[in-house]
Amino acid sequence: MKFLVENINKNSGRLGLLDLKAAGGGIQLKTPLLMQTTKGGSIPYLSADLFENYVQNKNGQEPVPVLLQLTLSTMQQMAESLALWPASLSHYLGFPGQGNVLLLRDPCESTPSGGNDRDVAPIFTRQGKESLTPERYMEIIASFKPDIYQGLCDADTNLESSKKRVQKSVDRTERFMDYIYEQHGKLQSTSSSLLAPIVGGYNIFARTQSIKHARQQPEGKYSGYILEGFHNNGLSATALDGSQLLPIVEHCVKQLEENKIKMMPGAYSPLIILELIHIGVDVFDTSYAYCAAVNFKALVFNYDEKSIEPRPTPFLDITDEAIKEEFVPLLDNCKCLTCQKHTRAYVHHLYKTNELLGPILLMIHNLHHFMGFFETIRSSIAQDKLPKLIDLVCKQNGDSKVDYSIEKNVKVISKAVVGKGFETTTES
């Protein structure tokens, strides 16, 4: 993996190019980059063909290559099969020619806290908790042969974590990484690139310690950084307070080399993503679009500076009875398959009748909208207009700041009244 910084604007962040040589011949990806979040190696609700033909391929143009975000917590059962697989990991998953990065935890689901023993890191799978030693982790990496993988770390921290818990996360990560750095050189035949984890919660001193440990490694030991330990994944990431998060990230970025890529996985809100890009973070994922879809929300926030219509909410609630007779697209002027072929009333009907097509159409729209958002971000940086985009996304042509946090939708379809509507449950 090679990363080239192409352009840095003082007011707008930076543009870069990520060159992956291991993805079946080599691909180039522009940054700021949006990884495609997967579950079990598949994009949620979408087959590989559906994604390529109706999301990745826009207006009949040649599909732009993507970087698949894979998570060990949803794929650990594949290690034995992949050890015998002769081709690339992306080819095994049905996405030949695409890049991939293997992370530990699923950013779409809340990660349980605890289980952090001295010499193991826990991952929580569908089969329960599995404890990973550094030795076992590197065996899995040798089987998966990902294009990029993150170093083993203890990222079980958030804003409420105690100083003791934060320090333990840093110390444990250093012990894990001492072994990972040593063994990574023996994986060179796989062409896998390593991301050094930077942990330490919201403690500047702990973050600095984590950075120093990574930077004291010999040149070439790793290819970039992954900043973790700010949240416990899932919906919690959508509600993070930028005033507390951004100063810590900015402190970290200033201490890291400019020529190394910086990744922050998690369902960060569009506004937080823009602020992080302004600071210098390069890679994010689509878990926010997924979290919105599974909670019956279509993304409709505005990022087109030509539009002057105020939007007090960034979402359209598909379960809202008010849209059951609205025969208009989910979002005006949207070019996705869902908005071109279907209406709000139809998608509402699909959810009301519990049809599988409902989440498929909603996921297509949300991914299309979020990918278009990143295209606009790159264009804004090139024109040094990112501050204007931040202001637009923040206020949505209104007078006050818009709330982008996603709350769990507790509306369910009663089996007794399927087709008649939704009712509210008290389930947490």
UniProtKB/Swiss-Prot annotation:
Similarity annotation: Belongs to the queuine tRNA-ribosyltransferase family. QTRT2 subfamily.
Cofactor: Zn(2+)
Organism: Drosophila willistoni (Fruit fly)
Name of this protein: Queuine tRNA-ribosyltransferase accessory subunit 2
Keyword Metal-binding in record: yes
Keyword Cytoplasm: yes
InterPro entries per the UniProt record, alphabetical: QTRTD1 (IPR028592), Queuine_tRNA-ribosyltrfase (IPR050852), TGT-like_sf (IPR036511), tRNA_ribo_trans-like (IPR002616)
Swiss-Prot/TrEMBL GO biological process terms: tRNA-guanine transglycosylation
SUPFAM superfamilies tied to this protein: tRNA-guanine transglycosylase
Pfam families named in the record: TGT
Recorded superkingdom: Eukaryota
Localization, UniProt: Cytoplasm
UniProt xrefs under Gene3D superfamilies: Queuine tRNA-ribosyltransferase-like
